[in-house]
Amino acid sequence: MPWWLISLTFIYRLFLCATIRTVEAPDEWWQSTEVAYNMVFGKGHLPWEWRYGLRSVFFPAVVALPFYLLKLLGRDTTWAVWFAPRVLQALVLTLIDVSVFRMGATLDELLAKRELELAEEMRQSKTKGFSYFREVFVSRSRRGICNSISYTALLLSLSNWYMAYCGVRLYGNVIEALLVLLTLQQRRYVPFLLLTGLASAIRVTSAVVLSPLVFRHLANATREHGFTRGLFRIVLTGLIVLVAVLGGVMVLDYCFYGRWVLTPLAFFRFNVLHNLSRFFGEHPWYFYVGPVLVGIVGPHVLFTIAAPLVLWRDTASRAVSRPVLGMLGIGAWTLGFYSLIDHKEMRFVFVVIPLSLITAAFVLVRWSRTSAVVVKMNRLFVLFNIVMIYLMGYVYRRGPLDVMAEVRDGPRINRLDVIATCYTVPGYSYMHRKVNHLGFVDCSIDLDEKTGLPKVTEDIMFRRYPKEYVLWRYDGKHSFNMGDLEESRKASELQSVVMPKSAPHPDAMVMTRAVAKEIEEPFLKRHGYRLYRTFLHSPLTLAPYEDIYIQMWVKVTK
């Protein structure tokens, strides 16, 4: 991939990372930039997973590097602390694009070699027949269209809506996808193991995703050194790399947690073996293989699933059957494995996108030679993705980041409370030095020692009784009718979870318009708050407990 194209790709990815204003899930802040901010600046809230040692500090430590550099140089301004992770994420996305291009280029080389062989066979043939005229027609129809898998795959990667929408966010899933792509390109066993170890340090499930590739390296080793020696080399090298990577991760986690903890095992036990992640939402087994695959790959998935047909009918294409079927196999294995876990999110299978797009590019190049309809379909699909990037990246659910932009550009606030559902907005990493104290509805999970199930949280109480929660938290009173048995039960439930007057009245409050209407008379106006600004969150709301508008209220000082 030429350097000028890499530079343009990075500029495009940086533009997306810096301008996209919508939100997807709280983990894009609270498992990355907020943890990194806490590591460097010693301030902020850590989600409950970090209390139980479920996550390795490896990924947040990578994010913390630009924070530490800014702090060391004394350049940690509000804007710089916000912008630095965007540069890092743009670099990760660009490397994914480069990997997509390189893997596509490998297919190009194999196809070009095979086509040269076929052309030579035809020239040497005395009776050319129908195949000769077909080859002439194909060569002519290739004029004026892109017949490069690498460039087509890059185009699909740059235009894919979910790659732009999710890839700009600092999820561990995105850098995991990069490491998986790099791993797939390794022919030597040691680099393969090292990259697999790094991917597993970020998300332990990567080890399961990449496990089928071990058999490929085992086959190569036994072919080169014999079965016994080859197996011995594979096992011994694997153990050495495993101890090195796992030991390094444990030392890094010890520095953060202050105790020895095997985070991959804790994560795997909690989310996979005990399946406790199901309390954050459950989906049917076909969720990934049905709506998610179609959703994240987009309409180009039609070309992806057509790859076996192309390999079967096109003689020249069989030269790339192993890598193409390998990518399809890894994608299917990934979807199948994650389908066994009840808690499912689209970003968990982010790595499937580049693999699917490379395969789709292969089909596009082969079919576009003889079909103008395929070329038009591709253009239409790319246009669809561009529209989706705009809607999902700049329109749908943009309220929280608009609030953060307002805080970054506004005067310093002593105390800002976000009265909304769990982790609706980012923390200090998005408003460095602009807010002295950030308060929010606590949703830290505490497991019951007897049942092993999560206890009721403040967030649950807020969802059930938003007005009463605010009155009880700040004023130590509620409006439940204690003479009514059901109302009395609700009051007791609230009092058992939320401490009365547990927070002072903040200088500013952020909440949905629906909550503001409910507490405007009994709380906001009573304590001298006025509406500062209303932010459009989304033209329509599909998620529960959301609203079309988010409002900021400020306390008027007399």
Curated annotation (Swiss-Prot):
Pathway per the UniProt entry: Glycolipid biosynthesis; glycosylphosphatidylinositol-anchor biosynthesis
EC number: 2.4.1.-
GO cellular component: endoplasmic reticulum membrane
Single GO BP term: GPI anchor biosynthetic process
Major subcellular site: endoplasmic reticulum
Membrane topology of the entry: Multi-pass membrane protein
One Gene Ontology term of the molecular function aspect: alpha-1,2-mannosyltransferase activity
Membrane-spanning parts: 53-73, 81-101, 164-184, 190-210, 234-254, 292-312, 323-343, 348-368, 372-392
Localization (cell): Endoplasmic reticulum membrane
Entry keywords, A to Z: Endoplasmic reticulum, Glycoprotein, Glycosyltransferase, GPI-anchor biosynthesis, Membrane, Transferase, Transmembrane, Transmembrane helix
Glycosylation sites: N220, N275
Keyword Glycosyltransferase found: yes
UniProt cross-references to Pfam families, sorted A to Z: Glyco_transf_22
PANTHER family with a match to the protein in the record: GLYCOSYLTRANSFERASE, GPI MANNOSYLTRANSFERASE 3
Role this protein plays: Mannosyltransferase involved in glycosylphosphatidylinositol-anchor biosynthesis. Transfers the third alpha-1,2-mannose to Man2-GlcN-acyl-PI during GPI precursor assembly.
Misc remark: The protozoan parasite evades the immune response of mammalian hosts and digestion in the gut of the insect vector by means of its coat proteins tethered to the cell surface via GPI-anchors. GPI10 is essential for growth of mammalian stage bloodstream form, while procyclic form (insect stage parasites) are viable but grow slower, suggesting that inhibition of GPI synthesis may be an effective chemotherapy against African trypanosomiasis.
Family the UniProt entry places it in: Belongs to the glycosyltransferase 22 family. PIGB subfamily.
Protein name, UniProt field: GPI mannosyltransferase 3
Gene that specifies this protein: GPI10
